[in-house]
């Protein structure tokens, strides 16, 4: 099908495919960040149930290193804040890519006479 398209339409179709790949990458990154955020929030909540005098350890590479309660709390709190910003940033990026995709898809459909063309949707396809 791509061989029958005008060069401008083929270029738009390639851009659409690139945007689709980018959207999938952003969605994957967002999902990973959301999972990390959930885990960090759970750890922070669990830390709230532990006495401050309890011996604490944190993972450093392959090692467990003793740490102070306040340090562990501060580190987790900072991690949660950073991940919240990351998730928000990725959501905005995901929205922006989706808008670009929809706009480009509309341009391509207009270019192909609104019949759905390469998207396979219209009666003239």
UniProtKB/Swiss-Prot annotation:
Q: Which GO terms describe its cellular component?
A: cytoplasm; prefoldin complex
Q: Which InterPro entries match?
A: PFD_beta-like, PfdB, Prefoldin
Signal peptide annotation: none
Listed GO MF terms: protein folding chaperone; unfolded protein binding
UniProt keyword Cell membrane present: no
Q: Fetch the Gene3D superfamilies from UniProt.
A: 1.10.287.370
Keywords on this record?
Chaperone, Cytoplasm
Location comes to:
Cytoplasm
Q: Which GO terms describe its biological process?
A: protein folding
Give the chief site where it resides: cytoplasm
Which domain of life, per UniProt?
Archaea
UniProt keyword rRNA-binding present: no
Entry's family note: Belongs to the prefoldin subunit beta family.
Task: Name the HAMAP family on file.
Answer: PfdB
- The protein's role, per its UniProt record: Molecular chaperone capable of stabilizing a range of proteins. Seems to fulfill an ATP-independent, HSP70-like function in archaeal de novo protein folding.
Assembly:
Heterohexamer of two alpha and four beta subunits.
Spell out the PANTHER family in the cross-references: PREFOLDIN SUBUNIT 1, PREFOLDIN SUBUNIT 1-RELATED
Q: What is this protein called?
A: Prefoldin subunit beta
| Taxon lineage | Archaea, Methanobacteriati, Methanobacteriota, Stenosarchaea group, Halobacteria
């Amino acid at each position: 099908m791509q061989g029958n398209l005008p060069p401008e339409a083929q270029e738009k179709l390639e851009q659409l495919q690139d945007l689709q790949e980018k959207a999938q990458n952003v969605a994957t990154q967002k999902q990973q960040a959301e999972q990390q955020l959930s885990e960090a929030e759970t750890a922070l909540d669990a830390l709230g149930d532990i006495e401050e005098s309890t011996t604490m350890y944190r993972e450093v590479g392959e090692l467990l290193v003793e740490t102070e309660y306040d340090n562990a709390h501060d580190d987790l709190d900072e991690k949660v804040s950073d991940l919240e910003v990351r998730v928000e940033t990725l959501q905005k990026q995901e929205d922006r890519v989706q808008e670009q995709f929809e706009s480009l898809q509309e341009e391509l459909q207009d270019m192909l006479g609104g019949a759905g063309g390469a998207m396979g949707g219209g009666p003239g396809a």
